[in-house]
Regions:
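Aromatic-lined, polymer-binding surfaces characteristic
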Residues: 405
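Conserved short loop/turn motifs at secondary-structure junctions
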Residues: 148-157, 376-379, 398-400
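Extracellular "leader-to-stem" segments immediately downstream of a signal peptide or signal-anchor
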Residues: 2-149, 154-369, 543-588
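Ordered hydrophobic segments in well-structured contexts
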Residues: 271-275, 315, 379-381, 389, ...
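Right-handed parallel beta-helix
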Residues: 165, 174, 352-363, 386-397, ...
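Short, glycine/charged-enriched secondary-structure capping and boundary segments
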Residues: 160-163, 371-372, 484, 533
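Extracellular beta-strand/beta-solenoid scaffold signature
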Residues: 184-226, 337-346, 370-381, 397-399, ...
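Catalytic domains of carbohydrate-active enzymes that cleave complex glycans
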Residues: 472, 492-588
Length: 588
């Protein structure tokens, strides 16, 4: 397909012929609208500062790509800069990650050395009790950094980070190792599925290093041990641990400010949930899919797993309260309509300001189990976490690598999955939003996979939205859109050996909602599946990918009719400018 066949794209890399200064200057008008408490989408068309010239891609006429150094700027990028918060195909993900994607993580000056609590780096003595004592002490003190010196620490239990502002820091992923000897099945118990069957939920949940609020973790484990298979998110095991703070007036996707009925329970800096409930006609789900004849014709009622994921719960921090006008730290992910009973609500106590850094978690090497029967030799999981992070961490010989479970605004940076092979190297589920996974690597497996296992890759599901995977090297796996209609997610600047398969139960509904974007993807084995998505994903953008063909797992679109998807710079990933969509959007 020629580059002129316009079916969508996005991106911008200030290191690739475009300067961050130019991007920032061009976004002054947008920023001014936010600072004034107005709707930034209204300010976006004026996104040009005096003396700074045009934003990249805004000068050329329709249907032409502007030259930028040796590369080309797609029409889609020019369009996006004119309406960054409301573009129909490209989501705004410029504030994804911890503290809006900040380059530096918070520093906690109080330091606790695990050796002072009895931990020994001899590879033989169980250090988990001492490490957990040190973490708990930091939590009781209001926060701190728990340090692990170089060496190997055997752990026979889960390492739990359950208090805010606590960081577990090793001496580097090549110097400090946690050697895990037992699975989550052994440590906590059998974990069945709330949807029935004989599946093990350890196949997609839980970690041997587990960051979750202490009370939420305790309630979750109690439910598992009682075999009352729980929901895992922000409103408790039965999704009833919340109360209304205020109703919200109608507003449009991309608005930073909403009007509320009663601001008395709101304050700047507080974390709240925006709760949107579906109506009997499933117009909320249709909206997530982009609306129009295709989603309207889709049969939603029998997608019982998908319908169990609503209400949609979006955690967001309040930036300012001015009378009944409430400004949020991120723009609205969806429209707010009366038929969806929009509310700001409470939630379980979050984990915030906590992280894990500079270590390797290595599980004892065991044979991989059949698909969906994992024992739970899992890596690092963030759950009910907001503004948390993982940096310079490797997991080895795990069933499932790094997990985001009802986690939002978190960053995984410089992470690596290695060893005998895994089921989900990365998973993002149960309504996880606004997360950033960057500088990540999935190594080739060291043990051949058995025929009854399945490799996914970078997973996203369960109405998870506005997440980003950036600057990745995937030596195996795929872009695992795992049904459950995730939407508005971005994969950018990734090299991929596309040899994995997606999963997802048919009752979980569509593979994709609206506004998925794949931008600058280098496919080394030429396989199209789940990378070229202009024939699958509604209102999507596929920009700057290698030429690919369909083989192995081949999908058909879930929605009928025109998908309103777009394809640009097909076959030219090296030419697309900007090269990295997330980095480019951070300039806006």
């Amino acid at each position: 397909m020629s580059e002129a066949h316009d079916t969508n794209g996005n991106g911008n890399d200030p290191r690739a012929g475009l300067t961050r200064r130019g991007l920032l200057g061009g976004a002054v008008a947008v920023g001014a609208g936010v600072a004034a408490g107005g709707d930034p989408a209204a300010a976006a068309p004026a996104a040009r500062a005096p003396g700074q010239g045009h934003l990249p891609g805004t000068e050329q006429g329709p249907g032409r790509e502007q030259e930028a150094g040796r590369g080309r700027v797609p029409r889609l990028w020019r369009e996006f800069t004119q309406r960054p918060y409301t573009h129909p195909q490209i989501p705004y993900i410029g504030r994804a990650g911890c503290r809006g994607g900040a380059e530096r993580f918070p520093h906690h000056p109080r330091v606790l050395d695990v050796r002072a609590f009895g931990a020994r780096a001899d590879g033989a003595t169980d250090a988990a009790p001492a490490i957990n004592r040190a973490i708990a002490a930091a939590g009781r003190a209001g926060g701190g950094t728990v340090t692990l010196p170089p060496g190997t620490f055997r752990i026979d239990d889960v390492i739990r980070v359950g208090h805010s502002n606590v960081v577990l820091r090793g001496a580097g992923s090549g110097r400090t190792t946690l050697y895990a000897t037992r699975s989550l099945t052994e440590l906590i118990g059998v974990y069945g599925s709330r949807y029935g069957g004989d599946k093990s939920s350890w196949s997609w949940a839980g970690g041997l290093v587990w960051l979750a609020p202490e009370a939420r973790w305790n309630s979750l484990v109690a439910a598992i041990r009682a075999r009352a298979w729980p929901f895992e998110g922000w409103t408790g095991n039965r999704r009833d641990a919340w109360r209304t703070l205020t109703r919200v007036a109608p507003a449009l996707q991309g608005s930073w400010t909403v009007t509320v009925t009663d601001p008395a329970g709101l304050r700047a800096g507080a974390l709240v949930l925006l709760r949107l409930s579906d109506d009997p006609a499933h117009t909320l789900l249709e909206h997530m899919a982009g609306g129009g004849p295709g989603p309207e014709a889709y049969v939603w009622d029998d997608k019982t797993k998908l319908t169990s994921y609503v209400p949609y719960e979006w955690p967001v921090r309040i930036a300012r309260v001015h009378g009944r006008r409430v400004t949020l730290e991120r723009p609205l992910p969806l429209d707010v309509r009366p038929e969806w009973d929009p509310q700001l609500t409470t939630h379980v106590q979050e984990l915030t300001g906590s992280g894990v850094e500079g270590l390797t978690l290595e599980a004892v090497q065991t044979p991989q189990q059949p698909h969906l029967l994992d024992k739970g030799y899992n890596g690092v999981v963030l759950q009910c976490a907001y503004d948390c992070w993982v940096d310079d961490v490797t997991v080895r010989h795990v069933d499932n690598g790094f997990g985001l479970v009802a986690a939002s605004a978190c960053t995984l940076r410089r992470t690596r999955v290695a060893g005998r092979g895994s089921h989900h190297p990365y998973f993002c589920r149960e309504g996880s939003h606004d997360n950033l996974v960057e500088d990540f690597t999935i190594e080739e497996r060291t043990v051949p996979g058995r025929p009854d296992t399945q490799l996914h890759g970078v997973n996203v599901e369960g109405l998870s939205s506005y997440n980003v995977w950036s600057r990745g090297e995937m030596r195996m796996g795929t872009f695992d859109s795992h049904r459950g209609m995730p939407f508005a997610d971005v994969r950018t600047d990734i090299t991929l050996n596309n040899n994995g398969r997606h999963g997802g139960d048919g009752s979980a509904g569509p593979l994709f909602g609206a506004r998925f974007t794949h931008w600058n993807i280098r496919v080394v084995n030429g396989r199209a599946g789940l990378v070229r998505i202009d024939g699958l994903a509604p209102y999507s953008a596929t920009v700057g990918i290698d030429e690919v063909t369909e083989f192995d797992q081949i999908d058909v679109p879930d929605f009928t009719g025109d998908l309103h998807a777009r394809l640009e710079l097909y076959g030219a990933p090296d030419a697309v400018r900007p090269r990295n969509l997330h980095e480019a959007q951070r300039g806006l």
